[in-house]
Amino acid sequence: DDVTDGCALAEGAQRVDAPKGAVYRFNQSPKECVAWLTSGADCKALGATELARWFLTEEGLSTKQLGSWLGGNSELQVAALRAFAGELDFGEMAVVDALRYFLSLFKLPGEAQMIDRIMQAFADRWAAVRADETLTADVVYVLAFSLIMLNTDLHNPQIAPDRKMTREQFVRNNRGIGVGGTD
């Protein structure tokens, strides 16, 4: 299992300290660790923004556990996911580069609903940072999902080489996703 390197916090954001042993607890049971961190039992209670900053700066967190926790549907998980995305500065990155960077910070869970929430948070953040009338959050969301499907298709050894998606198929599948049905 990969672990985070703790270097992804947006420029100017503050690092959040957590009690000793928090990384180990998170890697064993994210839900229990977050409940502990947000209770204020052994430290100042962390909110969604502080959790997001901790996730982005703390070294040694399990990227698999982080992705699964961020994809959850509790009010705190959704708020922390939005805060996590909100801490990232995609600057002038193209959608594909920003998505690659975003997904390098954790492992995407396998459950479709979790992926949906994560991609929505990514798309909303990218669109907020990049005021582009043609690449709205909805368009970026669909494009991000398409890129994930293309990547899965490309790297899945169970798909025969002659059955892999071609460039033409990818373009055809994404034709009309722009604002007003444009390309």
Report each predicted region and the residues it spans.
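Catalytic and GAP-homology cores of small GTPase regulators
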Residues: 1-125, 132, 141, 152-183
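A short glycine/serine-rich beta->alpha loop
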Residues: 130-136
